Every structure is written in C-alpha cells, then in structure tokens.
Amino acid sequence: MKNYIKGKHALAISILAVAPLTALAQAPVNTTDSLKLQAIHDSLDLQGVEVVAQKPIVRMTTDKMTYNVQQDADAKTMTLLDMLRKVPMVTVDGQDNVTVKGSASFKVYVDGKPNQMFQNNFSQVAKSMPASMVKSIDVITSPGAKYDAEGTSGVLNIKLMHQNGQSNSDCSNCYNGNVELSLSNKGERANAYIGGQHGKLTYSAMGMFAWQDFGNLKVTNTRLQQTSLGESLQTTDVEFKQKHPFSFGNFTLGYALDSLSTINVSAGVNGGYTNQNMQPRNSFSGGPYGNGFSYVYNSNQRNRFMGANASADYQRWLNADHTSSLTLSYLFDYNPARNRTWTIYNNVSGVTGLTLSNLFSDSRTWGTSHTGQADLTLDLGKGQTLETGTKFISRRNKSDSRLYDIVDCNDVLNDAGSMLYRNLQSIVAGYAQYKLTKEKYNARLGLRYEHTFESVKYAEHSDRNFHKDYGNLVPSGSIGYNITPMSNLGLTYTMRISRPGISQLNPYTDRTDPTALTYGNPSLAVVKSHNVTLAYNFFMPKVMFNVSLSHDYIGNEIENYQFVDADNKYNSTYANNGKSRNTYVDAFIRWVATKSTTLMLNGNVAYGDWKAKELGYHNWGWSANSYIGLEQQLPWKVKGSLGVFAQTRQYNLMGYNSGMQFFNASLTRSFFKDRLELSARYANPMRSHLIINQYNAGKDFSNLTHVSFPLQVIALSVKWNFGNTKKQFGQRQSKINNDFNDSQKKESPVGNMGM
C-alpha cells in the first residue's frame, strides 16, 4: 500500500464461507508498513448457502456463438440433430434439413477443420450421433479472414469430446471415458469414449454405431401441368420403410515436444447406408393422358456412403507468454458414395403418352482432397494482433453414372443415359487480419484472397470438356463496444462465397422417373453473398440475453428450379438466376428462475424476398421459428427437461414448406457418484405423425408434396462413466484467438457466459 491517503480507512472484505470483515485502519504519517488483517472465520453453516447462477452453456461474441452441449441436461438423451434445434441461429425443419440463419449454404467443420463427410451427409450423421459425443457447437455467422470463404451463411463447427496436445503438469497418468447404450422404438445405438494423458502424451478415441428403422412413411405428390393438349393431372402415392445404419470412429494423439511446441494427429472413419423398398401408385388424367390410367411399380433404392480423414498439426509458440505462434497443418479427406435404383414395371397396361421400361441406375462418386495450411499470429503489443497465413487445397472428384435397360433379366448398358466425368479443383488462398483491443473498444479488419482453378473432363465426350479459373477477394470486418462489464454491442460485415457442388454441376440426367428429368448444370458460377449484422449481448448471474439484426444480399444465387419442356417432361435443374434479400432478427434468452428451474427461448423472425427475373419468378414472405425449453431439478435427484419447437411456413423462390410443431421431454438420474446415468426421452410431433406440405409453382405447372412421418419416439439409455479424473485435457490457456481451440476472445467481456 504505497500510494495511500493519510487518515482513517475502512476496508470491507467478503469471502465465501467467511464472515464479512470490516477493519478500521489508521494510516500513520511517513510509514510504509503493510496493513495486517486477520480473517475471522464465523460459525457459518454452508447448508444455508444457495448459489443461483447460470451454467456456462452459451458464449457469445460479436461474430461467434458457442453452445456448450455438455452443460445441457438434454445431451444425455438427445441426438446431435435434436440438440441443434436449441442452438441460436440454427433451424432444423420437419424433414431434418438444417439451415443456419435460414440458409442451407453453410460449411460444416469438425474440430476447427472442414469435414467433407459431415458436409455431404450432415443430416444423416447428426440424427445418428448422440449429443453426448459433442463438446460444443460453434455458430460462426461472421467468419474472419482466417476462415475459408466458402459458405454463404457461415460456419457450423462441431467440437467432439477428445483431447488436445498440451499436457497438464498435475496429471501424469489420468484418464476418463464412458460407454452408452440406447434403445428406442426407432432403432438402437451404442457408443464409447476414452481419453486421457500419460506424461506429455494426450490421447482420445471414440466410436459409435447406430441403427435407425423408420416405417409407415407416406408421401403423396400431386402435379398439375399445362400442355398444348390441355391440363394434365399426375398423382403419386407411396408408403415405405427406411433403414439407416451408421457408424463413426475417431482417434487423436497429442504430444508436447517442449513448453513451446505441440503436435497433434487425428484420424477418423465413418459410413452408412439407406435402403428403401417402395411400390408407388401413379395416376394420370387429362391432356396427353386422355381419360386417364394408373399403374403400380416396384422401386428399390440403396444408397451407401463413407468417409475417411486424417490430419496433423504442429504449433510453435514464439514467445513465453504464448501470444504469438506458428501453426502448420495438413488434412486429407476421402469420400466415396454409391446410389443404386431399380425400377420394375409388372403387368402394366392401358398406358398412353408414356414409355415405361425396366431400368437399373448405378451412380458412383469419389471425392479426395488434400489441404496444406500455414498460420502465423503475432502479438504486436498494446492490444494489437496480426494474423496472416496461406492455404492450398487440391480436390479430385469423379462421377461414374450408368443407366441400364433390364431386358429378359439382363442389364444392358444404355450409353445415351450414362456418363463418366472428372472434376478437378485447386484453390490457392492467402489472408491477413488485424485486431485491436483498446479500453472499451475492439475492432477486426481482414482480407482474404482465394484463386480457384477448375476443370471438368468427360471420358466419352471430350468436346464437352472445359476449364475455368477465377479469383475472389473477400473482405471482412467488425467493431465492438463494451457498454458495461456484462454487455456489449457489435457490428460486423462479412462477404462469403459458395462454389457449386459436384451434384449441382453434374450434367448427368436421371431418367428413372418416366415423367421427369433431373440434372445439374456444369456452367454454374460461384455465388457471392454480403451480410451486415448488429448484435447485442447482455449477461447477469440469472439472466442472459442475445439479440441480433442481420441483412443478407445475394445477387447470383444458385436456385433449384423446375419447368415443363416441349415433351411434357417435368425438369429439375440449377442456375445462377436468383437474387435474394433476407432480414433476420434472432433472439436467445436463458433465465435461471430458481435454484432448480431454468427457462430458455431461442427464436427467429425473418422476412425474405426472392427473384429470378429471367424466369419471371418472384416470391416473398415472413417466417418464424422458436424453441421454448424448461429444465427442472425434480425430487430424488432427477433432472427433467421439456421443450416445444414451432415453425411457421418457410418460403423460397418457387413456393414454400409448411410449418410444424414438435414436443420433447426427458428425465435423467445419476447413481454411484455419477458413475451410472439412466435417461428416458419421449418425443411427439403433437399428433401421431408429423405432416409436412411442400408447394412450388411455375408458369406452366404446380406441384404439391404431402409427407407424413411417424415421429413419436420413446427412448431409454444407460451410460457408465469410468476413470480416475474428471479433467478435460485441453490446451493451456493463451491470449491468442486460435480457430482450433477454445481460447476465449479478448474483445468480449461476456465471452464466458456463466460462472
């Protein structure tokens, strides 16, 4: 106490479990003696102390939201897909389609790295994976220059429950893990996890197998078409079952070479398939079909997919404070898939205006990518940070689609309906990003450049080969102001791009439906989007609140559009013919009402406007969705959870999807010092079946699809936890904001929402 004021001073000290202490001290003249205080422990009974505060379940900054899945009681019973319904700015509709801020154009990362298998089959993977295997979910709506520019609505980063390379000095041989089994009326699931540390080595492994069996799915499709012969009506009714097994495994190793260097390696494999056996009934009348006819045919669809990935990262801290670093990374991805469809017509007669033939379609795709990256972060001092780096991606995609006519039980290749082609893509990128934190203000300014070299080669039709290369300059920036230690305000601007996928580019024509043609467009261009977001965050021990206002604009959006051709065939393809403007208000509220009751609201209201001037299409409308949740501590140490999800009609360029409602309830009880966990879950779509209606219309057609899902779910699960520690062996805390770890952002005073 060197710079004190002469006189008497009152010092009040309050320590948990220690009685408040007030000391009166006389500061004598010309003395530098330390003030000595003795804390007097009061006979305070801790049983009378109640601490009511937020769980650290959500962290929000200007450009990123992190949902801590492991702090959510529903993680013990829900799948990852179910959990996403509770995550701010993420929507899951009745057909399990996932969108971020209303858009399906987002990138999926796993542990901070792009994962192509998750990207290609995200809905199927998410509804098979238990939420207990996920540590947290990042919704990065305004990615900085350090992130890839792809994904017009941002990045969804899934962080799994495994260990990182930095070791803990107080844990020389620690480990923990769990084994879980789940049974439901929709399938079974088994998963296991183990992670730990031995000296400087950290490790983790996880595996999961799930089997889902959905029956009594019903689809009715009604299509009206205007033809030169008048109006025609086509109706398809089908009821079928769907089987979906899925398996997943992941292994990681980390080693601390010294106090400044770490190396991490990981490998993962996954796979699954879906089988559908159907007997659709088709009815036709009017126009070229005259008085009408109907027939039943057999359709058998078998779709298989798998993925394998491996990565290695080396990080070197450049100073003792761990604020400057060099990171070198490599990532490999391999993703083959195969889709087979048999279409068999038996005893069909009286058909006019159609040519029906037995067909077998066999389509195989292979995707391989290699990624190398170098990132340099420099602490410039006085709250300034410079980040720069470079990246190279090499992608090789191959598609072999073959159509066979089935003649006398033999498969005869149809050359006109078959296609083999390769898509080669190389991306070179570089970025620089400057960050400043000064008193109550923070700012980020970044610039990224990506140059793409792409070529498509056809094996049988070399005259169709083409090559193109293009560059994209992608700016981003943000500014934030800390209003109080518990609230902040931020404004961000982000430009994003979306390259067309192989399924959108593939010109192969699917002719398995005699009334329709489905194909891609190899001339699609990269999509550019612009986003401006104003966000406000507020936190108190019992209440946390986030609200954001966003506006998106896309001038050349890839639209999946339909039309009827001169042969009366219903065509579905893609084109850069769309312009869209969307304005969103997202809100998240979490309130600890009492020591045993917590309420949550996650909601979104949006207005969208879509145009395709060349096609003469224009649509607009309001939409909203919300999830209201209740967490309750019940007697006998039982944790209960209730949730209701509701969604209004969702619009697009050519129509809409109807709204839906969904109810979820769960109970969880732990035994033997949290070693054993028993959970039960019930999910109900407010009726025996979840009903979804999809409507789209053009100049010469209208199409209505009615889908019915039996989504009532009753599930029981048992989980056994083991190990000699509850530690999470994460990287040591640093002042650097690393995209690959959990370090807290310096610019956000409410970065760690909770304790």
What are these regions (language model features)?
Residues 37, 80-83, 122-124, 139, ...:
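N-terminal periplasmic accessory domains that precede
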Residues 80, 86, 114-141:
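Short acidic/polar hinge/loop motifs at secondary-structure boundaries
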Residues 27-73, 93-95, 101-105, 140-143:
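Short, acidic, small-residue-rich periplasmic hinge/interaction motif at the N-terminus
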Residues 158-178, 217, 221, 235, 453-455, 485-531, 551-569, 684-699, ...:
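Surface-exposed extracellular loop regions of Gram-negative outer-membrane beta-barrel proteins
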Residues 248-272, 297-458, 482, 486, ...:
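Face-selective signature of the C-terminal outer-membrane beta-barrel domain
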Residues 237, 369-373, 415-419, 519-521, ...:
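Outer membrane beta-barrel strand-and-loop segments of large Gram-negative receptors
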Residues 419-425, 468, 497-546, 553, ...:
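Outer-membrane beta-barrel signature, preferentially recognizing the C-terminal barrel domain
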